[in-house]
């Protein structure tokens, strides 16, 4: 996370750009891989939620009431069962304080906020959802069918977010430089491992491991293949052959989830 002041400043600028209404920024939820509780895919927070609220926990929503100048972090505190899995976790109130938000409330409050805004014909600004659980949540809250949510998303909010995130501050540039260093380590690792008899999957696994060792995760699934003509040639158990060209397309995210993209070619001579 950056400093509390960074997130306060970003939200203030967002309010100036959007001008009026209620902004709702949805964080991501855990996504089960094979079964609930401890079978999740690696958690990845929504980037826009991170930009304005900076918090990595699942099940959070940021609400910015521009006209009344009220910011609220919405989310439920963990229960005793969750403590078994996660240990001691900061309360939603404590999380809000960390990023300069003075108000917090349980998730059920979000429905009340939305109903109140709609009853007063106030504009509710959302971004186009891309996860199905969030699409269902938007449907429950605002009555907008998932098939219509892209069209109903706020263009004012989209333009404001694009404008702000397109300009990088010094602390963001430093994050991109960290991502560049990790990416360099990933691609030079691939170059060192390429030799006849090694599988594509082995090389890709080592490359991805570098991202997890020095950053938070890969920025997208590592592509490593002797079939460079295929755009998404994910690694297989194919064995590297002498004289063949191998394509490595891989990148990493820093602990603050900033990333760069790289592509390299390697050939065994």
Tell me the role of every PLM-derived stretch.
Residues 171-192, 198-211:
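Active-site pocket-lining segments that scaffold enzyme catalytic pockets across diverse folds
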Residues 1-185:
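A composition/biophysics-driven feature that prefers long, compositionally simple stretches
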Residues 52-56, 65-66, 229-258:
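Acidic/histidine-enriched ion/cofactor-binding microenvironments in catalytic or ligand-binding pockets
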Residues 28-29, 67, 78, 227, ...:
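Anionic group-transfer/hydrolysis microenvironments
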Residues 74, 257-260:
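Short glycine/proline-enriched turns and hinge-like loops at secondary-structure junctions
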Residues 217-228:
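Short, basic/aromatic beta-hairpin or loop at an interaction surface
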Residues 29-30, 205-219:
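Short beta-strand/loop turn elements enriched in aromatics
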Residues 262-269:
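Conserved small/polar residues in nucleotide/adenosyl-binding loops
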